[in-house]
Amino acid sequence: MSLSARISVTSLYRVEVSGWDKSQTFFVEKSELEWSEDSGKHVTLSSAVPDGSVVFLRLIQPLTADRSQSVPYETEFLSVTPDGQNQFRLHPVSPRIVDRGSVN
């Protein structure tokens, strides 16, 4: 009888996160994106970001002059770390379809 164990691999990426914090102040912060197939994408920020808000992540690529494109994510607040950092799970943002055929 063979038992196969599933190994979860977590990858870390340096990212630049930007958006608006709880006081509606725009911020840009460097952090690490933790990416796992099992638990999804997580980021820890010093900025207090409202739950459910949209932030933009840009991958920081060393050794290249090219800037990657920012990608929007919706935040899901998870917890505050012992040192006061805010932990979030990130969910992809899909474009919303607006019905412009309605006349008010």
Predicted region positions:
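Structured alpha-helical
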Residues: 1-104
